[in-house]
């Protein structure tokens, strides 16, 4: 949809709500997954800052930096007429010219780099760093890396903002967990583990974007999305805009919300986005249990933090959810339930009518707009050139650090290797085959802007010491074999073969789920023919979601298999360096690679994690089948010896009541505190230098059945260990990480026998016992709606 370049045109686009309400011809959003946004929602506007030195507000407390951000915002909003107030409730706000308040855009994207920024065609501000997609970043198991990436994105965002090319709020991160492998947006997430990985990613990304934990001066405002129970786009015709997800209290507490708890309570995120879908009959953006009882009252979301709708989801409360009788009622229901700002124009078009019908009051509208502007106060939006971060410029975008971090080889996962990798120095010529070999923007996944450069695998290998024979071979989804002969010819005259394929955003994307998890098109057929040539064969499996690579795993002539995700602007160079041994792989899968039949065994809309009926269980915690590659799988180029650290003594038994009676300075709740440190000695016993990564799992039969196979309680990454060198790795284990979730959604610590085991190989196992009485660590609140539906 083309953007409107004038705020005057934006205002002219607002139709009388009575005429719009009378139109009863609606899109079928039960099947259509892409909302039809109005031009105003996606408009390009002139971004600038208020003048608190000489402007109309300069003598008011709005410009008084000694007054609290909330009071300054409240003073500003008190000056608005009702029309001006309503105009401020959408993502695109025209501002208030008579007060010197410029237009503002809430909707900016920063998933793995800047998107929706106003880029120039060339020169300054024509690009920003494009990092790998989050699922690949999380596979590195490096919390520091996540924070560094977010901090660089935030710095670049502020530099663009200072130049009038970006807002100060970003609709990132996506912290939904990758529950089902067909989901098109799993690539945007930290993987399938909610309690540990998604929560850790949320904390590091949010604090990197915002400039710390609840800093006095915010760098940017992060938005934790999509709250909650959102992980389907259009599977089998089930549109995300109309899905009503049936989720038990147990699964809501255990899987669909713990990352939002960490985002709100620990990272102090300033914004949360409610999702398109309904949960248990109530659309998320009109769900006062979600938005007030759970998020604010239970999770501790900051009082002046604001909740934004997903784009047009306030409208979806009416169509297709039919939770409200009409659009004005949907708007009233959403804001009264706690959705402060509407990404879209439903609030702006229908609030006047809702006020006239006594469906809501001015105070209901003010509450959300004050929260938005309170954050802008914390961002220094009103404070002139002396405010924090206002000095950032294009020079801060063009930094060596951003180049180095964007070359993110750490997440690459070695799935299979018979010793072929790293390539022997005797290999002088290489055949490069496949649809992922000569790519450009495919490297970036989705939600991306212009990058300074895009290095494809073909580019990188052509710049290496190797002689390259390139052939396209076949497309991602093509059923043609026309390119096979050229691919085989290139392979026959080469010392080794690399095939790069898998899936891309033509098959997995926002609004697009897969119906299967097989390798698409004729790719496997071509790989099989290449494998019969008697040459070393390396396969690069690319894309965010997994495909069933069992045939490649079992084929002895496929020597090595690498998962490379969406590796960003330097992706080809990173893959080259892994293959040639300049860098060693140490990433681990943060999802399960299931066999192909998993995708058709049960509906992807079945949100139950535990096995039942045809559902064999979801995620590594509950899946009862045999995966192709397990969650946490990842090989190295070297070998490691892992043993208990002898100097660290760990008690074999802990009393539950004693643990909970401890003082807990620095922690809001005692259960957040580590009660032991799992410390191991890691020795590189091989010949190659390498990082080392580890996941620590717990398991038990304490508490009620059914029991999870295991669950993740911690992870870590050690930087490079040279041959014969050793380092200690310590993974703290918190009290809460050992708890289970009962059917009511309560987190309960049960007495019984437990094990802590390092990695899937269980290379070090620590048995321990908890004694005493079961203890409820946190109680799940009663699920009820606080706000009666609007009647019109």
From Swiss-Prot:
State what this protein does: Xylan 1,4-beta-xylosidase involved in the hydrolysis of xylan, a major structural heterogeneous polysaccharide found in plant biomass representing the second most abundant polysaccharide in the biosphere, after cellulose.
What is the similarity comment for this entry? Answer: Belongs to the glycosyl hydrolase 3 family.
Question: Which residues does the Swiss-Prot or TrEMBL record annotate as the active site?
Answer: 310
Instruction: Give the pathway.
Output: Glycan degradation; xylan degradation
Q: Which InterPro entries does this UniProt record tie to the protein?
A: BXL, Fn3-like, Glyco_hydro_3_C, Glyco_hydro_3_C_sf, Glyco_hydro_3_N, Glyco_hydro_3_N_sf, Glycoside_hydrolase_SF, Ig-like_fold
Enzyme class at the top of the EC tree: hydrolase
This enzyme's EC code(s): 3.2.1.37
- Keyword Secreted (UniProt): yes
GO CC annotations on file: extracellular region
UniProt lists the gene as: xlnD
* Key words of the record: Carbohydrate metabolism, Glycoprotein, Glycosidase, Hydrolase, Polysaccharide degradation, Secreted, Signal, Xylan degradation
Q: Which residues are glycosylated?
A: 23, 87, 142, 246, 326, 385, 391, 404, 438, 475, 479, 516, 677, 699
* Species whose genome carries this gene: Aspergillus clavatus (strain ATCC 1007 / CBS 513.65 / DSM 816 / NCTC 3887 / NRRL 1 / QM 1276 / 107)
Task: Kindly provide the name given to this protein in its UniProt entry.
Answer: Probable exo-1,4-beta-xylosidase xlnD
State the compartments where it is located.
Secreted
The signal peptide here is: 1-20
Q: Which GO terms describe its molecular function?
A: alpha-L-arabinofuranosidase activity; xylan 1,4-beta-xylosidase activity
Give the UniProt record's GO annotations in the biological process aspect.
arabinan catabolic process; xylan catabolic process
Instruction: Enumerate the catalysed reactions.
Output: Hydrolysis of (1->4)-beta-D-xylans, to remove successive D-xylose residues from the non-reducing termini
């Amino acid at each position: 949809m083309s953007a409107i370049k004038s705020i005057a045109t934006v205002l002219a686009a607002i139709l009388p709500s009575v005429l719009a309400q009378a139109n009863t011809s609606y899109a079928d959003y039960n099947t259509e997954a892409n909302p039809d946004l109005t031009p105003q929602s996606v408009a390009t506007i002139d971004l600038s800052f208020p003048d608190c030195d000489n402007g109309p507000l300069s003598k008011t407390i709005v410009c008084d930096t000694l007054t609290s951000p909330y009071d300054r915002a409240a003073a500003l909003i008190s000056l608005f007429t009702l029309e001006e107030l309503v105009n401020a409730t959408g993502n695109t706000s025209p501002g208030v010219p008579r007060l010197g308040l410029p237009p503002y855009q809430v909707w900016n994207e920063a998933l793995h780099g800047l998107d929706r920024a106003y880029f120039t065609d060339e020169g300054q501000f024509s690009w920003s760093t494009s990092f790998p997609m989050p699922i690949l970043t999380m596979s590195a198991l490096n919390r520091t890396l996540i924070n560094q990436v977010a901090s660089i994105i935030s710095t670049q965002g502020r530099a663009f903002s200072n130049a009038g090319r970006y807002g100060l709020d970003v609709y990132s991160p996506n912290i939904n967990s990758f529950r089902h492998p067909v989901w098109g947006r799993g690539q945007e997430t930290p993987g399938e583990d909610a309690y540990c990985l998604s929560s850790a990613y949320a904390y590091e990304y949010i604090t990197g974007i915002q400039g710390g934990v609840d800093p006095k001066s915010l760098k940017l405002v992060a938005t934790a999305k999509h709250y909650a129970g959102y992980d389907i786009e259009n599977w089998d015709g089930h549109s995300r805009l109309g899905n009503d997800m049936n989720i038990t209290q147990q699964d809501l507490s255990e899987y669909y919300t713990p990352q939002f708890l960490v985002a709100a309570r620990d990272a102090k995120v300033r914004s949360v986005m409610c999702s398109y879908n309904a949960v248990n009959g109530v659309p998320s953006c009109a769900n006062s249990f979600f938005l007030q009882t759970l998020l604010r009252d239970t999770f501790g979301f900051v009082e002046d933090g604001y909740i934004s709708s997903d784009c047009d989801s306030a409208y979806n409360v009416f169509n297709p959810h039919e939770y409200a009788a009409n659009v004005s009622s949907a708007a009233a229901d959403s804001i009264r339930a706690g959705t402060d700002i509407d990404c879209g124009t439903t609030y702006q078009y229908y609030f006047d009518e809702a006020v006239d019908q006594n469906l809501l009051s001015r105070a209901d509208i003010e509450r959300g707009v004050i929260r938005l502007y309170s954050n802008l106060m914390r961002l220094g939006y009103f404070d002139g050139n002396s405010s924090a971060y206002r000095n950032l410029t294009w020079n801060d975008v063009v930094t060596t650090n951003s180049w180095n971090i964007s070359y993110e080889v750490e997440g690459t996962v070695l799935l299979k290797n018979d010793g072929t990798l790293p390539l022997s120095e005797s290999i002088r010529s290489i055949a490069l085959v496949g649809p992922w070999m000569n790519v450009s923007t495919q490297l970036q996944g989705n939600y991306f802007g212009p990058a300074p450069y895009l290095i494809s695998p073909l580019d990188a290998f052509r710049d290496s010491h190797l002689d390259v024979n390139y052939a396209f071979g076949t497309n991602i989804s093509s059923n043609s074999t026309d390119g096979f002969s050229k691919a085989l010819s290139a392979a026959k005259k080469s010392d080794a073969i690399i095939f790069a394929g898998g899936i891309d955003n033509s098959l997995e994307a926002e609004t697009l789920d897969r119906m299967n998890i097989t390798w698409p098109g004729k790719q496997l057929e071509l790989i099989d023919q290449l494998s019969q040539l008697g040459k070393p064969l390396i396969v690069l499996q690319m894309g965010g979601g997994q495909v069933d690579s069992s045939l490649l795993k079992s084929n002895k002539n496929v020597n090595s298999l690498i998962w490379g995700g969406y590796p960003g602007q330097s992706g080809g160079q990173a893959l080259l360096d892994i293959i040639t041994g300049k860098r060693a792989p140490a990433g681990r899968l943060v999802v399960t690679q299931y066999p192909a039949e998993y995708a058709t065994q049960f509906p992807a809309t079945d949100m139950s994690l535990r096995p039942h009926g045809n559902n064999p269980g979801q995620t590594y915690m509950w899946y009862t089948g045999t995966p192709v590659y397990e969650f946490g799988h990842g090989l190295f180029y070297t070998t490691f010896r892992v043993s208990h650290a002898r100097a660290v003594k760990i008690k074999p038994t802990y009393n539950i009541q004693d643990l909970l009676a401890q003082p807990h300075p620095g922690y809001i709740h005692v259960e957040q505190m580590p009660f032991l440190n799992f410390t191991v000695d890691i020795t590189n016993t091989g010949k190659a230098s390498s990082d080392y990564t580890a996941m620590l799992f717990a398991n038990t039969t304490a508490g009620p059945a059914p029991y999870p196979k295991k669950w993740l309680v911690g992870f870590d990454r050690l930087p490079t260990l040279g041959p014969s060198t050793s380092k200690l790795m310590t993974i703290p284990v918190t009290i809460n990480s050992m708890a289970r979730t009962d059917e009511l959604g309560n987190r309960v610590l049960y007495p019984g026998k437990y094990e802590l085991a390092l990695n899937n190989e269980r290379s070090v196992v620590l048995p321990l016992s908890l004694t005493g009485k079961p203890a409820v660590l946190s109680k799940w609140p009663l699920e009820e709606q606080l706000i009666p539906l609007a009647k019109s």
